Amino acid sequence: MGALSHLRVLDLTRVLAGPWCTQTLADLGAEVIKIERPGVGDDTRHWGPPYANDADGNPTSEAAYYLAVNRNKKSVTLDISTGQGQALVRQLVAGADVLVENYKVGQLLKYGLDYDSLKAIKPDLIYCSITGFGQTGPYASRPGYDFIVQGIGGFMSVTGERDELPGGGPQKGGVAITDLFTGAHATIAILAALAHREQTGEGQWLDIGLLDVQVAMMANMATNYLATGTPPKRWGNAHPNIVPYQVFKVADGWIIVACGNDGQFRKLV
């Protein structure tokens, strides 16, 4: 039994940030019920190739990407645009502890599945909304993919080879780093909300935006700028503060030399 085995989570998320959060909760023991669209399911079910093979080694239509972030979950299909689907979600909410969703701002309000509506059914519900730009502000209504937010949030301005070198220019991370960090932040927020509920009996609405998380991820670069007034730039595989901390080509490939302090450097030389 995991630490969260006494909890039930409704997962109304798709793609990566939300599913990463709910998969973590499932790994910790929570019962996670994933609600998907009939006939389509989560977008990433179709993000292939590669596709998984069945027990006999035959290919399926299930993308490996989907399987990477949806283990340990139960999955049901509901059309939440219908009255019947909405009623079934409300029934599930009555017995749930946490709901996680990543619909565009205001979309669940149209279906009567927003926080205020569901709070009337389950007053101590913890309702976590994951969006590109948060619930308020000039960009709130915009959809936001990881790639877009990496650019807007400054990550691509410090990722990639230096501009003056061949191959220089903005690069996204090799994995969807903003989505993954956002999923982790959402998990932390939910765990904090559960602790708060245990002490007070109160539920709450958690507003998690990819852009907020991406800007927070820039902490050391932002502090360097605040201290010096010099905008951060791309350093390739080098470090903006310490040397040596980079990749070197050698006779049989590549090596990383990383010294985090003068003592390590003295031992190196």
Regions of interest found by a model, annotated:
Residues 152-269:
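Acidic, glycine-rich segments within the central catalytic cores of soluble metabolic enzymes
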Residues 1-189, 193-202, 234:
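N-terminal helix-loop segment corresponding to the beta1-alpha1 unit
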